[in-house]
UniProtKB/Swiss-Prot annotation:
Chain positions covered by the region annotation Interaction with BCL9: 373-391
The protein, known as: Pygopus homolog 1
Consequence the record notes for mutating residue 366 to E: Loss of interaction with H3K4me2
Upper taxonomic lineage: Eukaryota, Metazoa, Chordata, Craniata, Vertebrata
Reported impact of residue 354 to A: Reduces interaction with H3K4me2
Originating organism: Homo sapiens (Human)
Amino acid sequence: MPAENSPAPAYKVSSHGGDSGLDGLGGPGVQLGSPDKKKRKANTQGPSFPPLSEYAPPPNPNSDHLVAANPFDDNYNTISYKPLPSSNPYLGPGYPGFGGYSTFRMPPHVPPRMSSPYCGPYSLRNQPHPFPQNPLGMGFNRPHAFNFGPHDNSSFGNPSYNNALSQNVNMPNQHFRQNPAENFSQIPPQNASQVSNPDLASNFVPGNNSNFTSPLESNHSFIPPPNTFGQAKAPPPKQDFTQGATKNTNQNSSAHPPHLNMDDTVNQSNIELKNVNRNNAVNQENSRSSSTEATNNNPANGTQNKPRQPRGAADACTTEKSNKSSLHPNRHGHSSSDPVYPCGICTNEVNDDQDAILCEASCQKWFHRICTGMTETAYGLLTAEASAVWGCDTCMADKDVQLMRTRETFGPSAVGSDA
């Protein structure tokens, strides 16, 4: 019986030692230690290779991109709309179709006067204002029926046509910008295609509703356009053209702050504005000169031809005059507030704000510094020296000029001549 029972523990030990079939070849100590080491090696080396084939795609990189791109590119719009950003600057990469982004907004990198090749041949700058802002009811901003032709809207793009149109067409709204797509954005929709100039008519591109007004008679009254573009604002009473373009320009400038005219060469109202600006400039210049003369107590006879000198030189001249008037009573008491004297060379008036030199040698006449040819440096030195005496060429040419003088306060004075 003991012989039969002895193999049983050996069988149990072999089953307990490990799962490998080679465990029975060694002793019990070897059977307990070696199978664990073999399992550790199998756990570190074996699973390292199967995950590469189970989870990773095939080693071909093209197949990797296909696996990653197919769920996205085939089901969405990236493949079909990828070439659009390069050809269409108005669309973003993630906007399907031609929707909201490109219809009413202008991207900052696009020129503001470029017409859209997809959303109609008119400009998109003023598109967010669908209702009229004009008191005459004509401020419809580029309706879809107001087309001039194909892309870039080259009709009236030539400046010569713009100039001719500004001379031949009389329009109530005369504050257009010089833009090929915006010259006729606010023309009343009556008198369609009535242009008296055949050259202009030959250059029109036929559109759906090209509305142009011909040179109207002086007594022709303006009728507001009908509500054909879905405008919610009722048309105001009619206004006669004989009221002139000035009132219309004023109304338009007050009613259209963003539509103020920045180009001064578009139409007749610009010419009138130029004339007004010139008149204002002339008036400002006259008022400026009159105020200056009033400040200086000078008669406004318009004989002043010399440019005015800087304020520092004028102050120095005034200082010189005041000093010398106090030093020399025989100078007839001239000061900065007394009337001016004529120049001894150019016979024009010598103002107090000009560089002037007094001939103290003999003739006691005033001379412009520019007329005498004296430089500013020499004039500054002469002005800084209170006891210096300057003589004109005529006085210095005479032999009877007293070259030596004796001053009561300052002693012998320096004799200066500018011949």
